[in-house]
């Protein structure tokens, strides 16, 4: 493949048409921002499963991140608003089913490249977040020979409302879980199209943090993602336990959705789909924040993650799992239990980590989500007074994460310094700066 001048990127064909990426801020990396992976879920497609993306004419230059899905957001003045969302506000829309790809520039248009692929699912309690948050960037991943994909998926009432009338219009008699269906659709899009970016469709690692990690647990449990996942990283999403998921069934989810919509006078599908998105978000923020999340519908999710793990129904993948130091009280035991199951039942032990760095600048410690600055190597975007030791730690974290994506093992080839967590040796890799740094 002939090298192209800086500022140029080859056009490639993906589902829907021709696209062209743009140079990233890092040399020798190309980024594709805002690629549609499904039709906009608007109008009659509100509360329907993702539909195939429409075709476009000409070349779509993927130079702009998309709108984000409707969400309450994290206001400046709150902890997470101050930490991650202080810089800019992003336009919200129901037309939000887009993904972003970072790849080495010389890999674009080379299906024989077979580079490993990381598929990132953001967190946010299933009602916040998007794929181009300030922490999230794929430059450092691509420089290490890994293609990074980040996605948006429907959230809150838009993504997880179940309702008897929605189920009645669906041939299989189920509703809800639209946000998880979006994730599966995006994963299938990546499998079908990533070779055009130089990626290996048979070497995809799914990873996520918090509700994104709970989403990864759903993806590795779902029969609909069978054969699409080689490796999985579960960050601060618990292990064996109910963190971030619901064991409720279809009928219970429908009853919750109907009761909520009836309360506000929306009693039929026509009325429900006519409600302005702003109004739906308003009532969701007022009384629905903890009501809508994935549930067991018998099709996408046929059993809980816990049962899938115990029944050996999880994706046949390598697993890395962990949390931050401040997460460890609620999550540590759950994570240990998952690792023990992997060793005792599957004889394929997982790799466990603990992120213990207490971030500089405040006394907030190693809080939930603290590792994001490090795993994307975006410390220079943070307002915190990051030190040289923090940058070295970010290098270490990134090396381990990208090694796992490449090899299913966080160690460099020939090294076993990070040992798997087994019954006989329950090893946990700790990430921190050295004492005194």
Q: How should these model regions be labeled?
A:
Residues 6-177, 201, 386-397, 405-417, ...:
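Non-catalytic accessory segments of hydrolases
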Residues 16, 182, 200, 296-297:
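Acidic/polar residues in short coil/turn loops that connect beta-strands
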Residues 79-266, 309-332, 342, 347-348:
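Serine-hydrolase-like catalytic core of hydrolytic proteins
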Residues 141, 221-225, 363-367, 420-421:
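Short glycine-biased active-site loop of nucleotidyltransferases that positions the nucleotide triphosphate
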Residues 154-157, 207-211, 353-362, 416-423:
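Short, solvent-exposed turn/loop segments enriched in Gly/Ser/Thr/Pro and often Arg
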Residues 231, 239-246, 267-391, 395, ...:
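Substrate-gating cap/lid region and adjacent catalytic-acid/histidine neighborhood
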Residues 419-437:
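C-terminal domain-tail junction helix/linker
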């Amino acid at each position: 493949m002939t090298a192209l001048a800086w500022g140029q990127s080859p056009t490639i064909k993906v589902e829907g048409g021709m696209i062209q990426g743009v140079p990233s801020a890092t040399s020798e990396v190309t980024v594709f921002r805002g690629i549609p992976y499904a039709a906009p879920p608007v109008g009659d497609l509100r509360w329907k499963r993702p539909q195939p993306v429409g075709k476009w004419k000409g070349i779509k230059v993927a130079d702009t991140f998309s709108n984000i899905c409707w969400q309450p957001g994290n206001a400046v003045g709150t902890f997470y608003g101050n930490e991650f969302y202080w810089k800019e506000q992003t336009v919200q829309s129901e037309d939000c089913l887009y993904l972003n790809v970072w790849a080495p520039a010389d890999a674009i248009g080379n299906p024989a490249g077979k580079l490993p692929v990381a598929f990132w699912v953001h967190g946010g309690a299933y009602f916040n977040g998007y794929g181009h948050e300030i922490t999230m960037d794929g430059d450092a991943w691509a420089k290490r020979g890994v293609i990074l994909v980040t996605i948006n998926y429907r959230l809150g009432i838009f993504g997880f409302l179940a309702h008897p009338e929605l189920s009645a219009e669906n041939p299989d008699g189920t509703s809800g879980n639209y946000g998880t269906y979006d994730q599966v659709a995006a994963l299938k899009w990546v499998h079908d199209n990533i070779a055009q970016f130089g990626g290996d469709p048979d070497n995809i690692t799914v990873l996520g943090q918090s509700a994104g990690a709970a989403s990864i647990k759903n993806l590795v449990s779902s029969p609909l993602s069978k054969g699409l996942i080689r490796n999985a990283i579960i960050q601060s999403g618990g292990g064996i336990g109910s963190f971030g998921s619901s064991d409720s069934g279809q009928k219970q989810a429908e009853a919750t959705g109907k009761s909520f919509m009836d309360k506000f006078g929306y009693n039929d599908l026509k009325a429900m789909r006519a409600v302005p998105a702003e109004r739906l978000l308003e009532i969701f923020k007022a009384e629905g924040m903890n009501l809508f999340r994935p549930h067991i519908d018998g099709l996408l999710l046929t059993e809980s993650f816990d049962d899938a793990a115990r029944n050996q129904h999880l994706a046949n993948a390598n697993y890395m799992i962990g949390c931050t130091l401040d997460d460890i009280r609620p999550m540590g035991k759950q994570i240990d239990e998952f690792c023990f199951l992997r060793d005792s039942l599957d004889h394929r032990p997982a790799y466990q980590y603990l992120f213990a760095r207490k971030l500089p600048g405040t006394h907030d410690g190693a809080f939930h989500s603290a590792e994001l600055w490090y795993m994307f190597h975006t410390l220079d975007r943070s307002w915190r007074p990051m030190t040289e030791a923090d940058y070295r730690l970010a290098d270490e974290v990134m090396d381990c994460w990208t090694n796992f994506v490449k090899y299913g093992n966080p160690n460099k080839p020939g090294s076993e310094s990070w040992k798997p967590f087994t019954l006989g040796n329950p090893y946990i890799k700790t990430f921190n700066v050295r004492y005194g740094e």
